Amino acid sequence: MIQPQTLLNVADNSGARKLMCIRVIGAAGNQRYARIGDVIVAVIKDALPQMPLERSEVIRAVIVRTCKEFKCEDGIIIRYDDNAAVIIDQKGNPKGTRVFGAIAEELRGLNFTKIVSLAPEVL
């Protein structure tokens, strides 16, 4: 569960390394926490030099991994080692060209098929 002030890793090669959530905007209804597949507004806390994204830039991101376990539709419980997000643009397309780490299958049903196709492993 991601809430404002939560630090997240970046799971793509867009140039950012760490994000801090400042607002949950894509959750169902008016919820306080973001789960896998929800869109957040975040600020970049750490970035690589000479990359298009810079530190203290406000961006949108979709949550792809959380430490809080969640239950799949088939009854399997999945929990990841870290909180991670992929940076997206206003249309929902990823800014990076690669995605690192495992991605949840639930993103496919939420119209993030481009992120799922870039992922090396889908759980």
From Swiss-Prot:
Localisation per UniProt entry: Plastid, Chloroplast
Keywords: Chloroplast, Plastid, Ribonucleoprotein, Ribosomal protein, RNA-binding, rRNA-binding
Keyword hit for Ribosomal protein: yes
Principal subcellular localization: plastid
GO cellular component entries: chloroplast; cytosolic large ribosomal subunit
Keyword RNA-binding: yes
GO molecular function terms noted in the UniProt entry: large ribosomal subunit rRNA binding; structural constituent of ribosome
Coiled coil: none
Pfam families: Ribosomal_L14
Source organism, top-level taxon: Eukaryota
InterPro entries reported for this sequence: Ribosomal_uL14, Ribosomal_uL14_bac-type, Ribosomal_uL14_CS, Ribosomal_uL14_sf
One GO process term, biological-process aspect: translation
Family of the protein in this entry: Belongs to the universal ribosomal protein uL14 family.
Stored PANTHER family: 50S/60S RIBOSOMAL PROTEIN L14/L23, LARGE RIBOSOMAL SUBUNIT PROTEIN UL14M
Function: Binds to 23S rRNA.
Quaternary structure, from the entry: Part of the 50S ribosomal subunit.
Protein name as catalogued: Large ribosomal subunit protein uL14c
Gene: rpl14
